[in-house]
UniProtKB/Swiss-Prot annotation:
Belongs to the RNase PH family. Non-catalytic component of the RNA exosome complex which has 3'->5' exoribonuclease activity and participates in a multitude of cellular RNA processing and degradation events. In the nucleus, the RNA exosome complex is involved in proper maturation of stable RNA species such as rRNA, snRNA and snoRNA, in the elimination of RNA processing by-products and non-coding 'pervasive' transcripts, such as antisense RNA species and promoter-upstream transcripts (PROMPTs), and of mRNAs with processing defects, thereby limiting or excluding their export to the cytoplasm. Component of the RNA exosome core complex (Exo-9), composed of EXOSC1, EXOSC2, EXOSC3, EXOSC4, EXOSC5, EXOSC6, EXOSC7, EXOSC8 and EXOSC9; within the complex interacts with EXOSC2 and EXOSC4. The catalytically inactive RNA exosome core complex (Exo-9) associates with the catalytic subunit EXOSC10/RRP6. Exo-9 may associate with DIS3 to form the nucleolar exosome complex, or DIS3L to form the cytoplasmic exosome complex. Exo-9 is formed by a hexameric base ring consisting of the heterodimers EXOSC4-EXOSC9, EXOSC5-EXOSC8 and EXOSC6-EXOSC7, and a cap ring consisting of EXOSC1, EXOSC2 and EXOSC3. Transmembrane segments: none annotated. One of its GO terms (biological process) is RNA catabolic process. GO terms for molecular function: RNA binding. The modification N6-acetyllysine is found at K116. The keyword Ribonucleoprotein does not apply. SUPFAM superfamilies: Ribonuclease PH domain 2-like (SSF55666), Ribosomal protein S5 domain 2-like (SSF54211). Pfam families: RNase_PH (PF01138), RNase_PH_C (PF03725). This is Exosome complex exonuclease RRP42.
Length: 291
């Protein structure tokens, strides 16, 4: 993960500011930076989104392809995650430098979506035990400016919201052989419900307090962070600690309560933004180099 070198004086300045609920950039401990979200940015995908959170820039593309259901879940489709850490994001990712981080992020996403409530996987089933939709979710890290996991989870949810899956019909001939027919109408498609798709809220312990949406400088002052996956209703679906430091039970409880509080607000803002952007239709202004 991208890192930054700080002097002891800079670390003390950041820690003391957090103690007073006044961070270096003027935010409070539970405030996010400005989040920019744009969907439908990659033309050859079933759905896509780009998210900028401060200096963190994430691009997510979703590709729907037909596959075979897993043996243990014959009536469901499934999601596959791949994370690419671009060398443009930070020199540390050159060569195979970002492989470990990419694997860690992908495994975290698998844990978040490894339940029946996040996404209705049954809606991805075409023919039990034979055919289903497989959603390949590709995440590209364009720039790292702190708080990667939160930005990625927001981008994944936005991309799934934007995903259109072609409607299919299963036809059966007189001999019982099945044939799959895709609709010729590009607007005849199904969409996933993302209401229960969780977002990650990362809380970094700095001194005796914790902050959300930490910058690279703040992450350098933290020895332990808690990643909490929260739904729009404030339900925690996944939690893991990262970093070399430890967290006492009281801190974990406080951080979980903060994540629920912050997560609800984050979901409301994101859903409002996504619906507002969609209401603009194809005439909405394109921004960024992908526009």
């Amino acid at each position: 993960m991208a890192s930054v070198a700080l002097s002891e004086a800079e670390k003390v300045y950041i820690v003391h500011g957090v103690q007073e609920d006044l961070r270096v950039d003027g935010r409070g401990c539970e405030d996010y930076r400005c989040v920019e979200v744009e969907t439908d940015v990659v033309s050859n995908t079933s759905g896509s989104a780009r998210v900028k959170l401060g200096h963190t820039d994430i691009l997510v593309g979703v590709k729907a392809e037909m596959g075979t259901p897993k043996l243990e879940k014959p009536n469901e489709g499934y999601l596959e995650f791949f994370v690419d850490c671009s060398a443009n994001a930070t020199p540390e990712f050159e060569g195979r430098g970002g492989d470990d981080l990419g694997t860690e992020i992908a495994n975290t996403l698998y844990r978040i979506f490894n339940n029946k409530s996040s996404v209705d996987l049954r809606s991805l089933c075409i023919s039990p035990r034979e055919h289903c939709w497989v959603l390949y979710v590709d995440v590209l890290l364009l720039e790292c400016g702190g708080n990667l996991f939160d930005a990625i989870s927001i981008a994944v949810k936005a991309a799934l919201f934007n995903t259109r899956i072609p409607r299919v019909r299963v036809l059966e001939d007189e001999e019982g052989a099945k044939d799959i027919e895709l609709s010729d109408d590009p607007y005849d498609c199904i969409r996933l419900s993302v209401e229960n798709v969780p977002c990650i809220v990362t809380l970094c312990k700095i001194g005796c307090r914790h902050v959300v949406d930490a910058t690279l400088q703040e992450e350098a002052c933290s020895l332990a962070s808690l990643l909490v996956s929260v739904t729009s209703k404030g339900v925690v679906t996944c939690m893991r600690k990262v970093g070399k430091g430890s967290l006492d039970p009281e801190s974990i409880f406080e951080m979980m309560e903060s994540s629920k509080r912050v997560g609800k607000v984050l979901h409301v803002s994101l859903q409002s933004l996504l619906h507002k952007e969609e209401s603009l239709g194809p005439k909405r202004p394109r921004v960024g180099f992908l526009g």
